[in-house]
Amino acid sequence: MEVGQEYEIKNFTHRKFSMKHIAVMTSGGDAPGMNACLRAVVRAAHNNKLKIYGVLNGYEGLIDNQINKLTPREVGNIIQKGGSILKTSRSKRFLQEKFRALAIKNLTKKDINSLIVIGGEGSIKGAAMIAKESNLNVLGLPATIDRDLPLVGPTIGFDTAVNTALQAIDRIRDTASTSNTC
């Protein structure tokens, strides 16, 4: 990542927010905890009497207008599930300005003024682009097993991924030691 991009992301994370209608999306590779995060966002919005929309398939869904209302009932039983109920994608189209403009238009047509993006490095870069190119309030929630985001400590999913790998290694070692192969 170039220094200029870090600066843009730093500025983007310090914007003031005034949320009325919110869209939330997951993007890029999935990470453990995305559904739990999504559930928390939807419940918080509902408790504050805000309209909340879910974007299916990440940035591709923004471009294709796959934006639907979400209720607490729809996210009520997802906390223990892996992946993302909203699905994710990596979008090459979103890198083109005309498709970003279409994505922004799709949000504003539904009177959405705030976007929450749950994802890793590429997702957060995309969120920074939207923040820069629109009047939308944009919040990036880092969720990546790679822990490759600048200026960010632990991310949603990193600790779970590391501990899952460690448990698997411990089990393999235990199995190997019982057959005298170690």
What annotation goes with each model-predicted range?
Residues 27-30, 55-61, 90-91, 120-123, ...:
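Short, ordered loop/turn segments at secondary-structure junctions
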Residues 62-117, 123, 154-170:
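Glycine-rich oxoanion-binding loops at beta->alpha junctions
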Residues 178-182:
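Conserved anion/nucleotide-ligand pocket segment
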Residues 53-55, 131-155, 159-164:
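Short, acidic/small-residue loops that bind anionic groups at enzyme active sites
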Residues 17-63:
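N-terminal phosphate-binding or glycine-rich loops at protein starts, especially the Walker A/P-loop
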Residues 36-41, 121-136:
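Short Gly/Thr/Asp-enriched flexible loops that form oxyanion-binding sites at enzyme active sites
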Residues 6-18:
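Short, Lys/Arg-enriched N-terminal segments with co-localized hydrophobic residues
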